[in-house]
C-alpha cells in the first residue's frame, strides 16, 4: 500500500489535509472529510495515534512524583513524531513512523 501511495501525484488540497493530520485534535478533520484518499487516510491514522498519545500524557500528570517526568518525555515524543509526520507530508512521502505506524495499522 505504501508504494502505491508514494507513486501518486498530490494536489494542494491533499497536502493540506495530510498536514492537518499531525496538528493535534485537527487530525479528525482529514479522518472525517477525506477518508477516500489513501495518502490522507494514512497520515490521519498516524496523526490520530500521536494525538491519543498526547491525551494519555496529560493523564500522567495525575501520577505522583513520576507524572511530570512521564508527561515531559511523552510531550517531547509527541512533538518529534508530529514534526516527522509534517516533514513526510511536505516531501510527499508516506513514512511509517516507528511504533506509531504499528498502532495506526491496527486501527
Curated annotation (Swiss-Prot):
Keywords: Biomineralization, Magnetosome, Membrane, Transmembrane, Transmembrane helix. The chain crosses the membrane at residues 14-34, 47-67, 70-90. Its function may be negatively regulated by one of the MamGFDC proteins. This bacteria makes up to 20 cubo-octahedral magnetosomes of about 45 nm in diameter which contain membrane-bound crystals of magnetite (Fe(3)O(4)). Residues 35-46, 91-107 are lumenal. Residues 1-13, 68-69 are cytoplasmic. May oligomerize. Disruption phenotype: Single non-polar gene mutation and deletion of the probable mms6 operon (amb0955, mms6 and mmsF) leads to weak magnetic response and much smaller, elongated magnetite crystals. Vesicles that are probably empty precursor magnetosomes are present and can grow to wild-type size. It comes from Paramagnetospirillum magneticum (strain ATCC 700264 / AMB-1). It is a multi-pass membrane protein. It is found in: Magnetosome membrane. This is Magnetosome protein MmsF. Belongs to the magnetosome MamF/MmsF protein family. The lineage of its organism: Bacteria, Pseudomonadati, Pseudomonadota, Alphaproteobacteria, Rhodospirillales. Plays a major role in synthesis of cubooctahedral magnetite crystals by controlling crystal growth and morphology after nucleation. Has a partially redundant function with MamF. When overexpressed in E.coli the soluble protein self assembles into shells of about 36 nm. This protein mediates the formation of magnetite nanoparticles from a solution of Fe(2+) and Fe(3+) sulfate; the crystals are larger and lack alternative iron oxide/oxyhydroxide species seen in the protein's absence. Its main location: membrane. May be useful for the manufacture of precision magnetite nanoparticles of uniform mineral type, and consistent morphology, with high magnetization. Addition to an Fe(2+) and Fe(3+) sulfate solution increases the quality of the magnetite crystals. GO terms for cellular component: magnetosome membrane.
Amino acid at each position: 500500500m505504501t508504494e502505491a501511495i508514494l507513486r501518486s501525484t498530490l494536489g494542494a488540497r491533499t497536502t493540506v489535509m495530510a498536514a492537518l493530520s499531525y496538528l493535534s485534535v485537527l487530525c479528525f478533520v482529514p479522518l472525517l472529510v477525506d477518508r477516500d484518499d489513501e495518502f490522507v487516510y494514512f497520515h490521519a491514522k498516524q496523526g490520530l495515534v500521536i494525538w491519543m498519545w498526547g491525551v494519555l500524557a496529560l493523564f500522567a500528570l495525575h501520577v505522583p512524583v513520576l507524572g511530570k517526568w512521564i508527561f515531559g518525555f511523552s510531550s517531547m515524543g509527541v512533538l518529534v513524531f508530529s514534526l516527522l509526520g509534517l516533514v513526510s507530508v511536505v516531501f510527499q512521502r508516506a513514512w511509517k513512523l516507528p511504533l506509531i505506524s504499528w498502532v495506526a495499522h491496527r486501527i
